[in-house]
Amino acid sequence: MATCADILRSEFPEIDGQVFDYVTGVLHSGSADFESVDDLVEAVGELLQEVSGDSKDDAGIRAVCQRMYNTLRLAEPQNQGNNQVLLDAPIQLSKIMENYDCDTKLPGLLKREQSSTVNAKKLEKAEARLKAKQEKRSEKETLKTSSPLVLEEASASQAGSRKESRLESSGKNKSYDVRIENFDVSFGDRVLLAGADVNLAWGRRYGLVGRNGLGKTTLLKMLATRSLRVPAHISLLHVEQEVAGDDTPALQSVLESDTIREDLLRQERGLSLKIAAGRAEGSEAALLAEVYTKLEEIEADKAPARASVILAGLGFTPKMQQQPTREFSGGWRMRLALARALFARPDLLLLDEPTNMLDVRAILWLENYLQTWPSTILVVSHDRNFLNAIATDIIHLHSQRLDGYRGDFETFIKSKQERLLNQQREYEAQQQYRQHIQVFIDRFRYNANRASQVQSKLKMLEKLPELKPVDKESEVVLKFPDGFEKFSPPILQLDEVDFYYDPKHIIFSRLSVSADLESRICVVGENGAGKSTMLKLLMGDLAPVRGIRHAHRNLKIGYFSQHHVEQLDLNVSAVELLARKFPGRPEEEYRHQLGRYGISGELAMRPVASLSGGQKSRVAFAQMTMPCPNFYILDEPTNHLDMETIEALGHALNNFRGGVVLVSHDERFIRLVCKELWVCEKGSVTRVEGGFDQYRALLQEQFRREGFL
């Protein structure tokens, strides 16, 4: 029998993930509230009407609600009467007892503890209506509701310094360095950092690196929310959420991020109006002169030009800079959030994977721009070349601690290897010394003449510092299954293809490209140039307006979307996710498949929502490779992956026996995998014979012509 979730997915295939989570949460938590289908229509009908657009009228929405209401009633436990239910299959008690683990909660209990986060603004009306209904009926009965999935939140604690507290409270602390010592960060029961120290010197640019899931993003959030003590006089900005869409033009939105300038302009307008109306007092004229002086000091008149340069560098055309923010997609609004942060120039700028939202051109511009950044930056990035370009220092998060290194990423790699080698040598030397002393103690322990020497040696052992063996990070190894028979070309090609959604805006004209099982093709180009559209044409998800797509009859494509997280059910475990996608296989097979991509042990059983961005990507890879494709089409596969996994992914693709076409902005990854480089621009795709070096040189020359360098 179909569940309410199944009905929602079948009737509204385009339903937003947050709306889906909210509606299913209402259905399950408020099922006791619904005495009739009218109650259910009142609770979620209006929301479903918005989701359906014009595809369903009121009667259609009511019919869907009737199906879900019937499903809820059938799912209720029947404690009275002798109702008989026909089972789908016989129950084998012996197998149930074999699989039952007394220490493991039953699935039904687990679901009660799960929840989903919902966009409160978007669903405010529906929530208010449901709340009123629940309050009205609370006097009649006690409702048994299951709570929505609330993810664990991070917490931080740190040792306080009386001296720093006194300086802070007295206002005498004028330093812009950030020093946080002996602090802990936890995420639920997991300890991410223990007794850690972080020192951010003013004007330095720090790259924060480490494996997926260790707590880099959490550390940024702890700093941004000041859960870790950052001096109050230090302004900071954390680029995390996209800009809210409204009627404000993009350029004006950036200008408004400078609150000091906006406040001065507001004062200037108010004072000028008073003076013009003849209502000003003598002191207000002096105050206006003071405001003008301050505006001149911060070069307020040059602000629009500076904001425009930042927006242009991030890919906003002059026309786009005048568009209302509500007209931009989520990716462009994230760029807008980055532009606002760059324009505001905070004392401490916190960036979390800024290159994920950018194309190669914008990344190169950002590298150049940040190299002259006047204050402090802490950036989480897995883009090796980006860190080499902008970082003056590297902070390595591992083993629940933070280690600092001077220099860019390549310098960090060399220094880390030397440090580990020295630590190993010191550990081995001490172990050898301990063994030497222990041999003496064991030999003369019962010799009365040597008793004093034995005691001396024992004290010597006790005083030796306890050195731990070097904690080496495990090597990441990925392998794509390739147990398939190779076949002859042509494999996949587009011939003279035209494509557009609107005839007035042609995306591709007479596009001709081809790929075979030996291909290692990387597609680059500015955002909006049509890279993802071309991938969908190659896959057959989009049909050409004119022209032909040829695909070999044995071709089996595996597709990785840059929006893969949106396509995962975040409320179930990775094992359950694969079981739903590929039913009928033993659990060990799902676990083995996930283990290939580093999702093993308890990670495989945790809700996908609780995994880090990189771990979610690994789950998506496990799902993509389960059917053993012979050709991969990958759209930004390195987003959120740590450097070791990116490296392993590159080697896995090189060893794969099938074909690969991918879109990426990661320079090192492109150089590692790419045999052909295609540039997507102006409605066509061009092969660059000189590879990435030639493409980078073309972009740098373009920057010089446009005055960015």
Swiss-Prot record:
Residues annotated as binding ATP 1: 210-217
A single GO molecular function term of this UniProt record: ATP hydrolysis activity
Protein known as: ATP-binding cassette sub-family F member 3
Keyword tags: Acetylation, Antiviral defense, ATP-binding, Nucleotide-binding, Phosphoprotein, Repeat
Pfam families recorded: ABC_tran (PF00005), ABC_tran_Xtn (PF12848)
Free-text function comment from the UniProt entry: Displays an antiviral effect against flaviviruses such as west Nile virus (WNV) in the presence of OAS1B.
Family: Belongs to the ABC transporter superfamily. ABCF family. EF3 subfamily.
Family annotation (InterPro entries): AAA+_ATPase (IPR003593), ABC_tran_Xtn (IPR032781), ABC_transporter-like_ATP-bd (IPR003439), ABC_transporter-like_CS (IPR017871), ABCF_EF3_subfamily (IPR050611), P-loop_NTPase (IPR027417)
Residues bearing PTM Phosphoserine: 155, 157, 161, 283
Gene name per UniProt: Abcf3
